[in-house]
Amino acid sequence: MFKNNKPPKYGNLVTILSLDGGGVRGIIGGVILANLEKHLQEIDNDESVRLADYFDVIAGTSTGGLMTAMLTAPNDSGRPLYAAKDIVPFYLEESPKIFYGSKWWDPSALWALFRPKYNGEYLHTRLGEILGETKLDQTLTNVVIPTFDIKKLQPTIFSSYHASVDPSLNAKLSDICIGTSAAPFYLPPYKFPENDKMRTFNLIDGGVTANDPTLVGMTAMSRKSIIKHPDMDGFKPLEYEKYIVISIGTGSAKREEYYSAVEAAKWGFENWAYNWKHKTTPILDIIFESSRDMVQYHTSVLFQALESEDNYLRIDADTLKKDEVFMDDSETLNLENLKNIGEKLLDTNVMRMNLDTYTYEPIPKTVNNDQELKRFAKILSDEKKLRNKTFKTMIDDSSNS
């Protein structure tokens, strides 16, 4: 399905956009997405173009899954429901209604010891209003959204490819978004459909599977090559040097130190689940961070081995403070601060993972993230034009024969 973008077989590259999970920290990613879309509009001199017009796959986990749906679900005119510039205002308005009373010193938050901190009712209702009956196979470009099924104890990956071969996976986007956002401790697991005669899903946050869904998105296109799907004619399954990947994070406090083995040796179940001293959820944080870090490590190794490091752009802020990383802090001051962090990140030098230390370091070239986004936007624009030209030539040749 390439409704707005001709498939890779008409061009030279495979283009992928990946969006991390992170709750309200999705605001950081929203700022980056808005700038990328603005660059594309400027390069192509067309304010109507959208990100879905340029990417073969948009992959998103948790809050990234929600952004994926916003960017790819069609409106009544067959265009994306939201422009990238609409994401941050959406989060600023809706986050306080989803994560109500989010401060830990609010006595009402104590009930999270016995049930999910939030009931999720507003999120469920709002997603239903926005996405309606739109199903996975109706998105304007391919999407991949990871979740985890707690009944089967295995990942469930919702993708355009899977939806095309297995009707039971062609679920409503609203259901998929609710499932991938159901972070343990914060929001209740989500079951759908209610009719047990059909295949049912019992889902929690996709972050326990792939908080950074970059490799999931790349694999989705590789799988098409393996089965020799016509969209991927001319591409071998492992030709990742022909992939253009933009991966956008939601921030972390990597420069901060957290727990010591001496301290954790005294913990029982309660402190691992929620640590009152640090006001954190250690086991959940560890799962999400390790999931994300390993994806970034393997992706970095892959592109380095192929001598194609310039094809992979990872934009993330690892300098957040501990009180800035809460996925549910919906206080106005925090939300505005996250927006400012995203804007400052654009002016920050491009970073790449040091494969020995797992930390991010500036690349030798002095170039900031916004400049690199503009370079990638030019590549995306050129690829789109090439595909359109090739397609038109083939149609013209066919008509003349």
Swiss-Prot record:
Pfam family, one: Patatin
Domain PNPLA positions: 17-218
PROSITE patterns: PNPLA
Family annotation (InterPro entries): Acyl_Trfase/lysoPLipase (IPR016035), PNPLA_dom (IPR002641)
One MF term in the entry's GO annotations: hydrolase activity
Short sequence motif named DGA/G, residue ranges: 205-207
Domain notes: The nitrogen atoms of the two glycine residues in the GGXR motif define the oxyanion hole, and stabilize the oxyanion that forms during the nucleophilic attack by the catalytic serine during substrate cleavage.
Name of the molecule in the record: Patatin-like protein 4
UniProt organism field: Arabidopsis thaliana (Mouse-ear cress)
